[in-house]
Amino acid sequence: MRFYKIIILGLSLFVNYSGKAQQIQVLESGKRVSFRGLSVVNDEVFWASGSNGAVVRSTDGGKTIEWIPVPGYEKRDFRDIEAFSANTAIIMAIAEPAVILKTTDGGKNWRKVFEDTTKGMFLDAMDVYADKKKMIVVGDPIQGKLFAAISMDGGDSWEQMSPPHHQEDVRKVPDTEAMFASSGTNIKLINEKDFGTATLLVTGGSKARLKDLYRNTFNDSLPMMQGGTSTGANSIDYWSAAKSAVIVGGDFAKDTIAMDNCVLVNFKKGKPVFSKPSVPPHGYRSCVIYLNAKELITCGTSGIDISSDGGNTWTLISKESFHVVQKARTGKAIFLAGGNGRIAQLILP
């Protein structure tokens, strides 16, 4: 097997999947930081963000990782990050005040592009559309409604989202239903010929639901673990060619329970049809991504799983804990990030 990157800490974990060996190469570890935001621009450039004001960047595929200070925000929790290049990135500080910052010079300077001082405000995740202009940020309920704001200029300015006047506002939820800021992946902006622009959002808590936040055309209960403060959906990814999505979650307080933690979604004429995998992931999972129409990766505090059949069966390849996994938007590199300042690269055969 080829070695694509230099191992910074000299630590590689070898795993087997379908008779083939994978490697999880730990690139960074040991800091008192929990990474939950991760954005991989290409095979060379990625950014990550997390607790205690942590922002890091690599421009050489992880050979070196630069810790970038954000003056005045050293104690903030940056739960999500969206990067556009080695120089441009947007970070989200979750709560009171909720703040979004943008850099265009590789983190030398940060500009505040959004702030909300509303009591109880808690931002959960961001997503950016393929045009790199349209963006959305979502947050927990304020006065009975999930918070959502949009940007049409690549995050330079934001305004609160309002639903179409003729449709029911699917943002209305009980106080016991919200979103999990576990990996910045509970929201997905898509644009499909069959059903136009949609904003797929998953929730948890007392109810786990899949919502179309933009068009307000569905607000469906998910056949997955729910009912408690630590249960529900955490992450969604969508594959356009197959018109399908995969949702993962479970119970982060009981992270080894391997049931009711994954839902497969097939969209028929714009409406979701749910099914469960034959073999689910092996515990609570906070993030899921498609590599292609058939291959997916999911991770959480109790391990990493891979599927090669569209999410129907999952194989545990590691019990290592990670919060988030992302693939290069342009390229093939796959990186993971999690607690204790851990950043790793997953190398597939």
Residue ranges and their predicted role:
Residues 1-23:
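Bacterial Sec-dependent N-terminal signal peptides
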Residues 22-349:
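Residue-level hotspots at or immediately adjacent to binding/recognition sites across diverse folds
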